[in-house]
Amino acid sequence: MSKASLNVLLVSASLFADKGNSRALASSFVSALEASGQPFQLTHHDLVERDLPHLDGAEMQAWMTPADERSAEQRKLAALSDGFLAELRAADLLVVAAPLYNLGLPTQMKAWFDRVLRAGETFRYTEKGPVGLLEGKQALVLAARGGMYAGTEMDSQTPHLKSMLGLMGITDQHFVY
């Protein structure tokens, strides 16, 4: 019996490209997955190389407009987020290669999360609070830091990532520092 193919979505945002520690962690992960014999499909977004723009009001308004009521310009503005959402929904495993810059995420990675954290798409509001819509997925965070921050008050990145992933219903989270 053959193993089912694992659909892996990898997002990375190292300012130092192949010289960055988070990129090295991601490369090691992919190499280990290849060596495991597990069939997989990998979609990788280098958010720095892609030059992902920051979210603006026009783009957010485009998503808030029902798809069948969007103007041509709104459809164009929503296409980037809609594409990221389709990839995330299709993924079995989300791998986040996250360097720590100035106690937080790179702005490019925050811009990606801004586009996938969408009410009605990855979570919904209820009378008891938000409920994630992406249950059953796993997340692996490969966190690179220039110092010892994990488990200290200075680590604002880990709780931020846990909250964003949890908001979407991705509660099976693993962090490697």
What are the residue ranges of the model-derived segments?
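A structural motif corresponding to the C-terminal end of an alpha-helix
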Residues: 87-92, 137, 168-173
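Short, glycine-/small-residue-rich phosphate/pyrophosphate-handling segment
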Residues: 125-170
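Short helix-loop-beta junction
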Residues: 31, 35, 166-171
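Secondary-structure transition/capping residues
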Residues: 40, 123-124
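Gly/Ser/Thr-rich active-site loops/lids in small-molecule metabolic enzymes
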Residues: 116-121, 164
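Beta-strand-loop-alpha "switch" segments that mediate conformational coupling across diverse proteins
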Residues: 175-177
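N-terminal beta1-alpha1-beta2 submodule of the flavodoxin-like/Rossmannoid cofactor-binding fold
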Residues: 1-98, 103-107, 111-114, 118
